[in-house]
């Protein structure tokens, strides 16, 4: 059926498609950081840094189609470290989106710094092993990775996106923009799509599509915020 054809297409085209995804992530990174330099809005800086981290993530996966050996291993190690260090920025994005007061923002940033430290530690502690799929060599977390690092990794994946969805609903109701909600919801939906369809070997690829949806929604939020500021 259609699912089988789609899977075959992804496996055949994977090595090329990940380069396209990396380029799209780079484009949104530039758009977000340029908007930040114009408007100096801290939420845009957080969004731009997450987009930058996701671009690096996609770039290293893309390089897995042409690179092997110690260089790819070192780049992959930094992929885990940057993911652990930057994804917690979703917490301040929630706080800025809700227009939280200074005491709440201070608390959120202290909490974020602690989660970042745990995320970076998790990135260095993760035991890497080779995985090959669709012409791409990737370093992934091995079964020998310490249990605490696995737990931190899982919390970073889901414990950051769920608050984004909840805060996104509140922002949607108050400000009438679904962009923050959709950024979290689409990321969560794509993360679940791989396991739900039984394509466990393609979870990384399907999640990359979710990441693009997330940074697209970040960009749309930035556009909305700019227009709102221009009207007031």
Predicted regions and their residues:
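Internal transmembrane alpha-helix with an interfacial aromatic "cap," most often the third helix
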Residues: 26-36, 60-71, 81-112, 218, ...
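A generic, lipid-embedded transmembrane alpha helix
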Residues: 48-66
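Alpha-helical transmembrane segments in multipass membrane proteins, preferentially the mid-helix core
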Residues: 27-34, 90-96, 141-178
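Non-cytosolic membrane-interface motifs at loop->transmembrane helix junctions
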Residues: 70-81, 201-211
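Membrane-interfacial loop-to-transmembrane alpha-helix junctions, especially the N-terminal start
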Residues: 38-53, 104-108, 174-185
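C-terminal transmembrane-bundle signature of multipass membrane proteins
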Residues: 160-232
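Membrane-proximal helix-loop-helix units in multi-pass membrane proteins
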Residues: 95-162
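Hydrophobic transmembrane alpha-helical segments in integral membrane proteins
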Residues: 6-28, 154
């Amino acid at each position: 059926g259609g699912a089988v054809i789609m899977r075959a297409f992804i496996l055949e085209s994977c090595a090329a498609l990940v380069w396209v995804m990396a380029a799209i992530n780079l484009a949104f990174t530039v758009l977000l950081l340029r908007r930040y330099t114009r408007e100096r809005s801290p939420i845009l800086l957080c969004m731009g840094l997450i987009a930058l981290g996701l671009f690096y993530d996609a770039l290293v996966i893309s390089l897995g189609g042409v690179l092997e050996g110690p260089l790819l291993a070192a780049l992959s190690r930094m992929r885990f470290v940057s993911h652990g260090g930057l994804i917690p920025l979703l917490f301040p994005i929630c706080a800025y989106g809700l227009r939280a007061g200074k005491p709440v923002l201070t608390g959120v940033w202290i909490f974020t710094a602690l989660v970042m430290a745990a995320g970076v530690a998790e990135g260095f502690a993760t035991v890497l092993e080779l995985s090959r799929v669709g012409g791409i060599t990737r370093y992934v977390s091995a079964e020998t990775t310490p249990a605490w690092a696995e737990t931190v990794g899982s919390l970073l994946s889901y414990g950051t996106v769920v608050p984004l969805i909840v805060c996104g609903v509140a922002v949607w109701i108050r400000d009438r923009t679904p962009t923050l909600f959709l950024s979290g919801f689409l990321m969560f939906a794509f993360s679940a799509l791989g396991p739900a369809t039984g394509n466990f070997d393609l979870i990384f690829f399907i999640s990359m599509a979710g990441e693009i949806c997330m940074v697209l929604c970040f960009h749309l939020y930035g556009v909305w915020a700019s227009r709102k500021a221009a009207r007031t």
